Amino acid sequence: QTGWLSTMYISRPKREKHSRLLRLLKMSRLTKISVLAICVACSSCAPRVATSFWKIGTEADSVRPGYTVIHAEGKTRHCYPITKWEDSADVDTYHQLHHHGVAVESELMAYRLYFDKKQTIDVYCKRTPQLELAQSYWYPNDSLLAEGYGDDILRVSGTVGVGSVKYWNGTKQVHIDAGKRCQYIADQTHHQATIGVTVNDWQVEGKSEEMAVQYTLFAGHRDMRCDVYTTHPIEGLCTGVQTIPAKGGSDTVTIILPNGILLASWGTDWPVNDTVKYGKETVGLGVFIPKAYAGMPVHDKQNNLCLLKEEKNTAHFYLTVCGATKENHPIATNATEWYDYLLKWAKKLK
């Protein structure tokens, strides 16, 4: 049984760490089920990333696997988990999905992708490093907040948020107004997870376009990688960071590096409309586009952006976030520290 355990559930670098457990198992008569139970209980083998994707239904859906009742936003929702959902543009899917789209989390950050033409990335920051969405469902109640759970930290409104893929019309960023949209969980292991969105019948630059955008989050990381795929080159694709607050924010920078372009912002704003229960959050946003995919930097009143330059109809970039007031031990407490951190982060990427 120990050979099965070490081969299937403990990677080679971890075997030395688990040698005491393996010696114990060799002397035992444990079944495979018992061995699996021990391994699951081991913290280093437990999942360190997770996804969250819920369809809002009715009590009749209680027969579905994973069905649960979620109390959020002042409502009681009968929900069941999904891995994929597709709808046409005339369906208000945004309000038919709990937390309005698919989400992914590591111990440090969680990100959700809105299921509408915005396709904006929104941010949930962890106060304590841990997986939380299986308990908070993005909207932690008072008792969870008292236990040290994180929360949403960014009001994205109609902006690019951080690392969303938008279209530059020559004067400002606009949303992806496609005929059909599909969100999905592409992949999930203990140490990484990928979520994505595809659009079809997107009328842009004189043609009907299809596009897929995937975000991958790794265990122990606050940053994500974004991969973009199109059927034909699209000159106006862009990404970037919003100003904070979305209206009136000004602390943004664009830095041309030898290996690409770094976009960043820093600021303070209320993350939600309830300004009585929730306080303002100070947040840092960053996006890095490798040189091969970095086009011309552009901006409008609410967004610091860069055009994406595709190679063989693909491009990729990276995004990251700091919750200066939310995290117990933030990596930056002011704009200068944040920009210094981003410079070191970006230099390692390609």
Descriptions of predicted regions:
Residues Q1-T2, R12-A50:
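Bacterial Sec-dependent N-terminal signal peptides
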Residues M211, R222-I255:
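Acidic (Asp/Glu-rich), glycine- and aromatic
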